[in-house]
A protein has these predicted regions:
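Short hydrophobic alpha-helical segments enriched in small aliphatic residues
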Residues: 12-15
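Intrinsic disorder/low-complexity segments in short proteins, especially the signal peptide
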Residues: 8-10
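Residue-level detector of structural "landmarks"
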Residues: 1-4
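Active-site-adjacent structural elements in enzyme catalytic cores
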Residues: 20-206
Length: 206
């Protein structure tokens, strides 16, 4: 690589980092079992307009964006510094929300759904056309989870959207189990952090 190309690449990276870190991140504390409806509604509105909200799940904190909005999903990759070919997981808040985002639910998958959802189990399905390629990393399949955490379920339900959400940390860093961990990596890069205390499991879903 020539010096000119190297300098241009470095400048592009710096501009991307600066562009990603220009907002004030809102921090809201929520009761992990009975989250305040007004705070949840605030987070849901951010998601609807294409913003990013970090929220607790039973496993780790997730970084959520509108899973049907390609630009919002690209924002997740940018905030985390995550390779765009590394697929995201779509989160739903009830079983009926699965059918619109997948082409089919095999009988074997339905048995697992009946046994383990809601909970820390991520499943892979053939994706429906409505799911953007930015979610799946260009694959024909999509990962879906139905979390059991009250804050996560309330946020998804209030937004009326499948929420694309990897762990809410900088790529390559440990997965966050507290809001303070999220803030350390992503403060200024995302719109909101919902602080629901420590994640129960502390490990990402299967």
């Amino acid at each position: 690589m020539t010096l000119a190309l190297a300098a241009a690449a470095k400048n592009t990276k710096n501009v991307a980092e600066q562009t990603c870190k220009i907002m004030k991140t809102i921090l809201r504390k929520v009761d992990p079992q009975q989250p305040d409806a007004a705070i949840i509604a605030e987070g849901a509105e951010i998601l609807k307009r294409g913003g990013l909200v970090a929220f607790p799940t039973e496993t780790v904190y997730g970084l959520g964006g509108n899973g049907l909005d390609s630009e919002a999903c690209k924002g997740i990759y940018l905030a985390k510094g995550r390779p765009s070919d590394n697929p995201l997981i779509l989160h739903i808040s009830q079983i009926s929300e699965l059918r619109p985002i997948v082409r089919e639910v095999p009988a074997a998958a339905q048995k697992l759904i009946d046994a383990f959802w809601p909970g820390p189990l991520t499943m892979i399905f053939p994706k429906a056309d409505i799911v953007p390629d930015s979610v799946t990393g260009g694959l024909d399949t999509v990962a879906v989870r139905f979390p059991s955490h009250p804050v996560a379920m309330a946020l998804i339900r209030a937004s009326g959207l499948p929420i694309a959400a990897p762990s809410a940390n900088a790529s390559g860093k440990p997965s966050p189990t507290r809001a303070s961990h999220v803030a350390f990596d992503l403060d200024g890069k995302i719109d909101m952090i919902l602080d629901g205390g420590a994640a129960e499991w502390g490990l990402e879903s299967t």
